[in-house]
UniProtKB/Swiss-Prot annotation:
Basic residues composition-biased segments: 12-28
Protein name per the record: Small ribosomal subunit protein uS11
Subunit structure: Part of the 30S ribosomal subunit. Interacts with proteins S7 and S18. Binds to IF-3.
GO CC term (a single one): ribosome
Name of the gene encoding the protein in the UniProt record: rpsK
Length: 135
């Protein structure tokens, strides 16, 4: 049996990111009790840039802090600005602590915030909530 030779078929192909020229878009901020995720999309909903607290470098309980939300929103906004984003409409979802901080940091980076909407899903008395924690 001849020795096996290695081939490059398993190598990863790195695709270059193309610059999208989008001036106006949507910023979706999902702020949970454990994490904050910011996705910036074009008006049709295609994601241009995103960031999460874990991706920015926070681990464990530090992901749920307002500072982590601030850094997450800044990272996503900078990536979106590379694609020409200047103005966003903000959609906030979830009960987390980083909601307002993320919006403020979007403005601080230089994105103009057009409107802010709360799109947190509210049940019409659907599932029973989890029991209260006793610590």
């Amino acid at each position: 049996m001849p020795p096996k030779t290695r081939s490059q078929t398993g190598a990863k192909k790195v695709r270059r990111k193309e610059k999208k020229n989008v001036a106006h878009g949507h910023a979706h901020i999902k702020s949970t009790f454990n994490n904050t995720i910011v996705s910036i999309t074009d008006p049709s909903g295609a994601v241009i840039a995103w960031a999460s607290a874990g991706q920015v470098g926070f681990k464990g309980s530090r992901k749920s802090t307002p500072f982590a939300a601030q850094m997450t929103a800044e990272a996503a906004a900078r990536r979106a600005q590379e694609h020409g984003m200047r103005k966003v409409d903000v959609f906030v979802k979830g009960p987390g602590s980083g909601r307002e901080t993320a919006i403020r940091s979007l403005q601080a980076v230089g994105l103009e915030v057009g409107s802010i909407q709360d799109v947190t899903p509210v049940p019409h008395n659907g599932c029973r909530p989890p029991k209260r924690r006793r610590v």
